[in-house]
């Protein structure tokens, strides 16, 4: 991953634009019947928890809810498969704060596996943080997106 200013085409050092979590959120935001990863599989062993998360994202969903967005600027979308929700948020090169309202969830407690841009993601696009927490339909999550950043979660009923 690379920030906007550091991105370049180099054959022996492939990179993608945007933060690590921006790339992870794409698996939820963009509906695609065939998901794939670029590069050598051994490259993904460095951050196994990211690969494990991506592997759990289905290629088809039962329900889709557009939570927020503005064309060419940002998007937040929730998709359900069975009893599991996947939420993805992505921004363009403008950093932003957003609130993700979880009122689409049914009653009860859920476990949210969350990946967010790290504190240094605006300078080091691979920086991310992972959090696991209990959430309910009453929660509103405050999210900070780095330039070219993202946020994603897998939410399962407890």
PLM features: residue spans?
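Glycan-recognition surfaces
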Residues: 1-41, 68
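Conserved, mostly hydrophobic/aromatic
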Residues: 29, 87, 148
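Edge strands and adjacent loops of beta-rich recognition modules
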Residues: 51-77
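Beta-strand-rich interaction surfaces with strong enrichment in secreted/lumenal proteins
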Residues: 64-65, 76-77, 85, 130-132, ...
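Carbohydrate-binding surface patches
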Residues: 71-107, 151-152
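Solvent-exposed beta-hairpin/edge-strand motifs
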Residues: 104-118
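Solvent-exposed beta-strand/loop surfaces of large extracellular or lumenal domains
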Residues: 114-138
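C-terminal beta-strand-rich structural cap/linker in extracellular carbohydrate-active enzymes
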Residues: 132-158
